[in-house]
Amino acid sequence: MKQFGLAAFDELKDGKYNDVNKTILEKQSVELRDQLMVFQERLVEFAKKHNSELQASPEFRSKFMHMCSSIGIDPLSLFDRDKHLFTVNDFYYEVCLKVIEICRQTKDMNGGVISFQELEKVHFRKLNVGLDDLEKSIDMLKSLECFEIFQIRGKKFLRSVPNELTSDQTKILEICSILGYSSISLLKANLGWEAVRSKSALDEMVANGLLWIDYQGGAEALYWDPSWITRQL
């Protein structure tokens, strides 16, 4: 409804204030991003200049990386293996830390199972970390009993929860790797399982966060691999 008098004036004034605030926030955001880029370039220059000291002193190196993290700059973005900036072991150590952080942040979403492909294409996409780098880094995590590497149809996955996957769960994930989901009828058609066995395995995987259940697809519930859903978000 159109406003008249003082109410209309207040509405117009509020609209102008909102526009001004939005413009100021956008300008500040651009300025902050530009300042961060400049500061990151300066940090790289500093690291190159003092590279020998950084390599020689773990304490100096640790403080430098902590400073980077505290201001929102990922230390991985500063590594340059071609120019021997820091050491290769430091690079893999930082990748390990980031993998652990990613597993912790996504555990409630994927039940503690994440593919190497998702790690590379989604979480490390902007950091120039390849599959070989991930494999070498994650190999360093094998000493931690809660990390395990396994394969499904030739693709590598990382499990970061102490509960091992059962053979039934692995077979269900194999089907999910093809279609993105599984169901009681799919398991019966492909594996010959009875409905009780299928529902028990599927419900347990839902409870552990390995699958998400969807009742909207039709008469039968579908059990989705979370990575197929999150990649569309």
From Swiss-Prot:
The keyword Membrane applies. It is a peripheral membrane protein. Transmembrane segments: none annotated. GO terms for biological process: ATP export; negative regulation of transcription by RNA polymerase II; protein targeting to vacuole; protein transport to vacuole involved in ubiquitin-dependent protein catabolic process via the multivesicular body sorting pathway; ubiquitin-dependent protein catabolic process via the multivesicular body sorting pathway. GO terms for cellular component: ESCRT II complex. Pfam families: EAP30 (PF04157). Residues 23-46 form a coiled coil. InterPro entries: ESCRT-2_cplx_Snf8, Snf8/Vps36, WH-like_DNA-bd_sf, WH_DNA-bd_sf. Keywords: Coiled coil, Cytoplasm, Endosome, Membrane, Protein transport, Transport. It is found in: Cytoplasm; Endosome membrane. It comes from the Eukaryota. GO terms for molecular function: lipid binding. Component of the endosomal sorting complex required for transport II (ESCRT-II), which is required for multivesicular body (MVB) formation and sorting of endosomal cargo proteins into MVBs. The MVB pathway mediates delivery of transmembrane proteins into the lumen of the lysosome for degradation. The ESCRT-II complex is probably involved in the recruitment of the ESCRT-III complex. Belongs to the SNF8 family. Present with 1040 molecules/cell in log phase SD medium. Component of the endosomal sorting complex required for transport II (ESCRT-II), which consists of 2 copies of VPS25, 1 copy of SNF8, and 1 copy of VPS36. The ESCRT-II complex interacts directly with the VPS20 subunit of the ESCRT-III complex. This is Vacuolar-sorting protein SNF8. It comes from Saccharomyces cerevisiae (strain ATCC 204508 / S288c).
